[in-house]
Amino acid sequence: MAIRKYKPTTPGRRGSSVSDFAEITRDHPEKSLVRPLHGRGGRNAHGRITTRHKGGGHKRAYRVIDFRRHDKDGVNAKVAHIEYDPNRTANIALLHYLDGEKRYIIAPQGLKQGAIVESGANADIKPGNNLPLRNIPAGTLVHAVELRPGGGAKMARSAGASIQLLGKEGSYASLRMPSGEIRRVDVRCRATVGEVGNAEQANINWGKAGRMRWKGKRPTVRGVVMNPVDHPHGGGEGKTSGGRHPVSPWGKPEGRTRKPKKASDKLIVRRRRTGKKR
């Protein structure tokens, strides 16, 4: 993938860029693997906003991705197409299995149309193959990693993401996460070899607010420019700093949003670097 930059023909085009989609081999999805996707606008069943800054955006169809490939162990598949997925930053690969079934997976870096991929404990160590961590050599970069055996891929699924397998000791494997955190995971958990493709996506300059609205992202308004009725930082004459430590619209101090005593924390060997004092 490469980035195509626009000439500054308008203020919105100045500095903006877009993917050249050179890796994409088909412009429409597999019909049997598409489901309707209804926008919620960040609202719950009562109609109240529970997630801010969401709403609108272009209509999308959901592509069903296979995050549990254990039921295809020993069945080879051919990469029929590399496709664009509007629901994620990574591209997706359409697999045609020898038994006739078709499935989507996240497309790793270097996976080409016509390649053969497989899953299972005896699979080769090459991009796109899925196998348990116990069968992957230390130092290998992987993605789409399970947190629990059979639970489906949860970690490192976005464009350019990868996890490094540092080593194995007993029934646990040590992984270096994209955040820098080192975590222990059961060696029976599965992972896909290689890095997620489309890494240049992070370098796209969106150029104008309208492109964010196409993606379903609404504006983020600072509390200091609101009225006192809307935010604890609101009000004041002229430009003010808020007059207190940063808080949420409901008065809770910023940061420290994670559960302090999560059960799985005992599997974290080294925490991610946050730059904040704990």
Swiss-Prot record:
Residues 23-33, 253-268 have a biased composition (Basic and acidic residues). Pfam families: Ribosomal_L2, Ribosomal_L2_C. One of its GO terms (biological process) is cytoplasmic translation. Residues 1-58, 224-278 are annotated as: Disordered. The keyword Ribosomal protein applies. One of its GO terms (molecular function) is structural constituent of ribosome. One of its GO terms (cellular component) is large ribosomal subunit. The keyword ATP-binding does not apply. Residues 37-58, 269-278 have a biased composition (Basic residues). NCBIfam families: rplB_bact. Belongs to the universal ribosomal protein uL2 family. HAMAP family: Ribosomal_uL2_B (MF_01320_B). Part of the 50S ribosomal subunit. Forms a bridge to the 30S subunit in the 70S ribosome. PANTHER family: LARGE RIBOSOMAL SUBUNIT PROTEIN UL2M, RIBOSOMAL PROTEIN L2. One of the primary rRNA binding proteins. Required for association of the 30S and 50S subunits to form the 70S ribosome, for tRNA binding and peptide bond formation. It has been suggested to have peptidyltransferase activity; this is somewhat controversial. Makes several contacts with the 16S rRNA in the 70S ribosome. This is Large ribosomal subunit protein uL2.
